[in-house]
Swiss-Prot record:
SUPFAM superfamilies hit by this protein: Methylated DNA-protein cysteine methyltransferase domain, Methylated DNA-protein cysteine methyltransferase, C-terminal domain
Gene3D superfamilies: Winged helix-like DNA-binding domain superfamily/Winged helix DNA-binding domain
Protein name, entry field: DNA base-flipping protein
Role played: Involved in DNA damage recognition. Binds DNA containing O(6)-methylguanine and larger O(6)-alkylguanine adducts. Binds to the damaged base and flips the base out of the DNA duplex into an extrahelical conformation, which allows processing by repair proteins. Also affects the regulation of gene expression in response to alkylation.
UniProt family annotation: Belongs to the MGMT family. ATL subfamily.
Length: 147
């Protein structure tokens, strides 16, 4: 399912377990999302861009194929509040991972907005990469009032 946003289209895929993928895309990456969960995700994304600050925690994610470490990281990042940031190093210390491992896992995260990887920055305030699109990360952090 395509979700239009101010940043461009997002592609959504769902499985019986939850959201399988939500990410910026120029072309479909898999089967079309349908059903109640797809509609809930669409409504939550629309609410986010309307400034309503949903936390997305009520949306189940399908972590099939992910390592236990990556699952723990994604679940922890889901708890970073709207308008706040946390550092790669702080997450790494908390979860027993290196900051580079945190960054690599977040770059590969298929759950755009639902796992708010854009809220993870360097301890010195530099943004760091974000799916290869630092400008997108900057836009989201400004939109949320974190910068």
């Amino acid at each position: 399912m395509w979700l239009p946003t101010p940043l461009g289209p997002l592609w959504l895929e769902v499985s019986p377990l939850g959201v399988r993928r939500l990410e910026p895309a120029l072309y479909p990456r898999g089967p079309e999302a349908e059903g109640a969960l797809a509609l809930r995700v669409r409504e939550a994304v629309q609410a986010y861009f309307a400034g309503e600050r949903p936390d997305f925690l009520d949306l189940p994610l399908d972590y099939t194929g992910l390592s236990p470490a990556r699952l723990r990281l994604y679940e922890r990042v889901r708890l970073v509040p709207y308008g706040r940031t946390v550092s790669y190093g702080a997450l790494g210390r908390e979860l027993g991972l290196s900051p580079r491992a945190v960054g690599a896992a977040l770059r590969a995260c298929p759950f755009f907005l639902l796992v708010p990887a854009h809220r993870v920055i360097h301890a010195d305030g530099r943004l760091g990469g974000f799916q290869g699109q630092e400008g997108l990360k900057l836009w989201l952090l400004r939109f949320e009032g974190a910068l």
